Amino acid sequence: MTTPSTAPTPAPRKAEVSRNTAETQITVKLNLDGTGKASLSTGIGFFDHMLDQIARHGLIDLDIQAKGDLHIDGHHTVEDVGITFGQAVAQAVGDKKGLRRYGHAYVPLDEALSRVVIDFSGRPGLEMHVPFKSGMIGTFDSQLAYEFFQGFANHAFVTLHIDNLRGDNAHHQAETVFKAFARALRMALEIDPRSAGVIPSTKGSL
């Protein structure tokens, strides 16, 4: 009598990355196969709220602790969180075998609608078109959303397209962008059982 074989348990896709400069001290811990739990402290309330959307809608367990030169402004903190988050995602993804690779999502919030498309291509690039209706959202400079996603794309080695298709409220615009990013990321990071152990590229590498 033969014993049925069982599939090997996949290795947990977790990472911890720290970044320490004269401007910021940041630690990111994540589990790509989590349930959306978050512990976030950047000193910028609205930014924490947006990072929470990534965790919740991306089903990523996310712990980000950041201290930065907020007496100047939020630029270094937001950009460096994006960089460190990108590095952590790249580390957790590993060789990309079995990865769906591509992800996309549309997310509405009242009058606002955003679309995000992501490709774990190994070729960093960001195309972002979000005409924010206000320069500030609470204490968050809306221009810094670009810096966050630029830092992420460059260090996660992804191609990222972000478009706000409509919106009259800057808070709604930002929230749809971050939620759509989370949903697209969640899709791209899924492991496809039909291509387990296979890198999703005809080149054989990414």
Swiss-Prot record:
Name the domain of life.
Bacteria
Top enzyme category: lyase
The question of whether Cytoplasm is a record keyword is answered with yes
Return the Pfam families for the record: IGPD
Swiss-Prot/TrEMBL GO biological process terms: L-histidine biosynthetic process
Instruction: Write down the Gene3D superfamilies for this protein, in alphabetical order.
Output: Imidazole glycerol phosphate dehydratase, domain 1
**Record carries keyword Cytoplasm:** yes
InterPro entries registered for this protein in UniProt: IGPD_sf (IPR038494), ImidazoleglycerolP_deHydtase (IPR000807), ImidazoleglycerP_deHydtase_CS (IPR020565), Ribosomal_Su5_D2-typ_SF (IPR020568)
What's the Enzyme Commission number for this chain? 4.2.1.19
Q: Its principal location?
A: cytoplasm
Sorted alphabetically, the keyword list is:
Amino-acid biosynthesis, Cytoplasm, Histidine biosynthesis, Lyase
Mind telling me which NCBIfam families this protein's record contains?
PRK00951.1-1, PRK00951.1-5, PRK00951.2-1, PRK00951.2-4
Task: Tell me which family the UniProt entry assigns to this protein.
Answer: Belongs to the imidazoleglycerol-phosphate dehydratase family.
Please state what the protein is called. Imidazoleglycerol-phosphate dehydratase
Q: Which organism is it from?
A: Polaromonas sp. (strain JS666 / ATCC BAA-500)
